[in-house]
Amino acid sequence: MRGFRLIAPIQRSIAIISRLQPITANFHSSPALRSHENPLGIPKSPASAPRIPRKTTRRPEPIAGVKKTIVVSSAKGGVGKSTVSVNTALSLAKRGLRVGLLDVDIFGPSIPTMFGLSGEPRMTHEGKLIPMSKFGIQVMSMGFLVDPNKAVAWRGLLVQKALEQLLQDVDWGTLDVLVMDLPPGTGDVQLTIAQTVKIDGAIIVSTPQDVALVDVVRGLDLFEKTYTKVLGLVQNMSVFVCPNCNHETHIFGVDGAVSKAKSRGLGVLGNVPLDPQICSQSDKGVPVAVSGGVQAKYYDKIAEGVAEQLGV
């Protein structure tokens, strides 16, 4: 059976956890706080709400060998974030840049499928992971380190150790740009990366629909509180063009992400239509940015805007 290669740090953590003795705790809630409207007794005062710490004991540092690091984020899943990450990274490489792509979606890594890559990465004599290479860029993913047919059922400590190894123990060589594909949401992974790694810019991906835009605001709030520059928004699935009659249908609404970007003083890096070719090429392991299709132009535009803002 195939195992995972995050050997030393995570096995030590498992050993520590296995030695812990079970404890029994009784939790009591104040009757005054519990009601039919608020059965959990959650404080309603904004002053008591948890806040993202603005300062940490550790200053964010660049990843060794990497000149610029950007993250691709979506506070909501299913908006095509990984597709944007992959094709933007490939379009940056087409500009002559040395590019790496790091998939830090611990529980749902999809980058290996989109690149048609499998197997386990080799390791250096120093014990660092060597990224796989395809289409001219370096690729590392949690998907290379675990059994692809089994769920990653880890809790906080193991997730933290896995994330630390992906951030610290990969030998990238020398890169002009590292693109990080973040998991959806605004949880521990995003916060840890924002507070420990020097991020030169963030791309936020959204569809035009209102449900996705609500989460965009949460993502923007996270980056503002961690002092991370947002390079702009990508409006994905902006329109569907019928392949038979060329009729345009705005399935998810019209320019919702564009309007949200303008209201927050942000630019729009690009609009990507809902195109079956983009999906099918990703499933085949040959993304449109390298397959030569007309769809590549959308990601080339995004890459142009990113490179201009990064100064690379």
From Swiss-Prot:
Q: Is Metal-binding one of the keywords UniProt gives this record?
A: yes
The record's Gene Ontology biological-process terms are: iron-sulfur cluster assembly; mitochondrial respiratory chain complex I assembly
Region named Disordered: 32-59
- The transit peptide spans 1-34
Swapping residue 242 to A/E/S leads to an effect described as:
Reduces the amount of fully assembled complex I
Question: Which function does this protein serve?
Answer: Required for the effective assembly of the mitochondrial membrane respiratory chain NADH dehydrogenase (Complex I). Probably facilitates the assembly of Fe-S cofactors and subunits of complex I.
What is the protein's name according to its record? Answer: Iron-sulfur protein IND1
- The protein's organism comes out as Yarrowia lipolytica (strain CLIB 122 / E 150)
Please spell out the taxonomic lineage of the organism that makes this protein: Eukaryota, Fungi, Dikarya, Ascomycota, Saccharomycotina
Q: Which gene encodes it?
A: IND1
